[in-house]
Amino acid sequence: MSMTASKALAWAASQIGYSRWDDPLPGSVYGRWYAERHGAYYCESGVPFCAMFASWCLTDDDGNSVIPGGDFAYVPYGINAARAAGQLVDPSNAAPGDLICFDWDGDGLADHVGLVEANYGSWVQ
């Protein structure tokens, strides 16, 4: 089955309430998934998992990433891959299922990523 925005959002919604702090295994469920694909480092407890979670949500039933450039664990890498593929869009044009990146500390380097559920023009959910 191919990946759709609805499916990605359903997978994301199915994880509401998950906490890596309550996970009895090392790291996060998304870090362990990413580690199976890319190396053990990503399974460590202290590794932030937002990009790995986004990558997990945007992987089809055959295990193929539908993200430009494939899975990513570092938000700026995902941005660079989207830019290189000509798929970087202004947040005001983001559609449900698109990835949206945030620069929480205002240093010019994005440090968080999530999935757009809805776009209301001046803000996204």
Give the label of every model feature segment:
Residues 1-64:
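N-terminal capping segments
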Residues 63-125:
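...with weaker cross-activation on analogous glycine-rich loops/strands in unrelated enzymes
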